[in-house]
Amino acid sequence: MKITSLKNRNLLTMNEFNQSELSHLIDRAIECKRLKKDRIFNLGLNHLNICGIFLKPSGRTSTSFVVASYDEGAHFQFFPADNIRFGHKESIKDFARVVGRLFDGIAFRGFEHEVAEELAKHSGIPVWNALTDTHHPTQVLADVMTVKEEFGRIEGVTIAYVGDGRNNMVTSLAIGALKFGYNLRIIAPNALHPTDAVLAGIYEQTPERNGSIEIFTEVAAGVHQADVIYTDVWISMGESVSVEERIALLKPYKVTEKMMALTGKADTIFMHCLPAFHDLDTEVARETPDLVEVEDSVFEGPQSRVFDQGENRMHTIKALMLETVVP
């Protein structure tokens, strides 16, 4: 299906684009990856300026925006979190209107999703959600690209997400399922199932029904015949919860070699949006080893595609900027 121009479009949630437009972005990202491998740089963003507002820590996402910008000839400017105090001395609206006159796009990572919406409303330039408390759409673009590279398709693929079913990744993956046509199984304890309100919002705001969303409590049933087992850390950035209570809830959902075998498929892959606790090489994991959400043998094993996902963050972000920025 022919798509209309994506110029000056935002990516605040996966619902900003329809299936054809999202598929086009994935195909463009795959092409960007090929060109990068061949060291071909077309400078599609030459002499443009990209603004980076990162109010939460960021590794892969921020560097992906930086590298993608420089590859295509753009300048990327970080605004340090300490320099931005929305609502203290300057409103989001006023800040956005100035930035919109100086820059050609905004990458925003923060807490309240409403801040991203305000930036998009008043800046007049594309705003890309690099993660908020409720959505993480740029990660799902990389995930879908990784799945398509692995299986040659995304439609009909079964992704089993194991862990905290209420986080921003699950929400974005769920919208992505209805858009792209993959089947998402959310496998979590009852206390961490997505709320009825969140699920209702996903279905209400997503017109497509190309894939499915199912919720499981029992691991074996949820992962059976899954093409992908996906997990994330058990406590999200900025989340204030009892570590002991969260471990007690999610320890049965730790991704292990045994869980991978429960799929009954030899070609099941493992995915993780990173950063991950998979060994004792971090202070947090050494202090609380029971917080490790995936066995190191799975994370480092032949079924793992976590570093493909990490690389594909850059290619999908590059495609997103090339398609949406007005030159």
From Swiss-Prot:
GO cellular component: cytoplasm
pH dependence (UniProt free text): Optimum pH is 8.4.
Keyword list, A-Z: Amino-acid biosynthesis, Arginine biosynthesis, Cytoplasm, Transferase, Virulence
Residues the entry annotates as binding carbamoyl phosphate: 109, 136-139, 273-274, 313
Enzyme Commission code: 2.1.3.3
Keyword NAD annotated: no
Subcellular location: Cytoplasm
Catalytic activity: carbamoyl phosphate + L-ornithine = L-citrulline + phosphate + H(+)
Top-level division of the source organism's lineage: Bacteria
Enzyme class: transferase
GO biological process, alphabetically ordered: arginine biosynthetic process via ornithine; citrulline biosynthetic process; L-arginine biosynthetic process
Keyword Zinc-finger recorded: no
Major location category of this protein: cytoplasm
Signals that turn on the gene: By N-sulfodiaminophosphinyl, the inorganic moiety of phaseolotoxin, at 18 degrees Celsius.
Pathway(s) this gene product operates in, as recorded in its UniProt entry: Amino-acid biosynthesis; L-arginine biosynthesis; L-arginine from L-ornithine and carbamoyl phosphate: step 1/3
GO MF term set: amino acid binding; ornithine carbamoyltransferase activity
Binding locations of L-ornithine: 168, 232, 236-237
Self-association and partners: Homotrimer.
The family this protein is said to belong to: Belongs to the aspartate/ornithine carbamoyltransferase superfamily. OTCase family.
Function (record text): Plays an important role in the survival and pathogenicity of P.syringae. Phaseolotoxin is a virulence factor that inhibits the catalysis of the host OTCase. Phaseolotoxin-producing bacteria do not suffer autointoxication because they possess the anabolic OTCase ArgK which can function even in the presence of phaseolotoxin. Reversibly catalyzes the transfer of the carbamoyl group from carbamoyl phosphate (CP) to the N(epsilon) atom of ornithine (ORN) to produce L-citrulline, which is a substrate for argininosuccinate synthetase, the enzyme involved in the final step in arginine biosynthesis.
Miscellaneous comment: This enzyme is insensitive to phaseolotoxin, a potent inhibitor of OTCase.
Protein name in the entry: Ornithine carbamoyltransferase 2, anabolic
Record organism: Pseudomonas savastanoi pv. phaseolicola (Pseudomonas syringae pv. phaseolicola)
